[in-house]
Amino acid sequence: MDLYVSSYAPSLSALIRARERARTQKNAPGYANVISFAAVGQAQPGGGQELRELPEVEREIHRIRDETNMPPDMTFEIVTGDAATIEGAIQAFREHRWVHLACHGAQDADKPFESWFAMRDGPLTLMRIIQERYTRSEFAFLSACHTAVGDASTPDEVLHLAAGMQFAGFNGVIGTLWRVDDAIAHEVVTRFYREMFKRPVIDFEYAAEALNVAVVESAKEVPLEKRIVFVHIGI
């Protein structure tokens, strides 16, 4: 980690599309370096989902707002509780360039488009996400379990949640390889955004490097196997 920065791509074509999309976005009239950012968190999923409460979700999101030196001109919307529904999340995806998602998530290896994030009124499936068009989206941080896990038997054929978000229109995505420890997630997430926001020009294309910095900075407090749960995909 001290010698190189890791980033992955579901396929070469996905990487090419993301680069072309990012170039088009940045060259579009009216594009400005003022980031519109939404944090979507669901601590108490409903809709018949039998999932444990996630009491640390609100704390994670408020640490992003309060402890990362967020630029004062950044638009930051918090979508939690009753507002963090399927349609509430989709609206945040449509309206903001960056999205942070803190909730339960699960991969369905047999039916990858049925993989989901748990919202207040039920599961937000990958199929539902890709039905929309996201012209503004640039970057998504998926602070949920198993969002970048494929299938060991067919690693090149399974569309996991992080790859699906890139396919839907997010040029860069951070996902997780296994269950996320809440306390560790808080530290890595806070350090990641602090690193992103300290640059004179805030750009989502710095995400892979910022994640590497956050993971390395956590080395003294966090064991390696828990630090490397987060991976960057795309650009």
Residues of each region from the PLM?
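Catalytic cores of enzymes
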Residues: 1-235
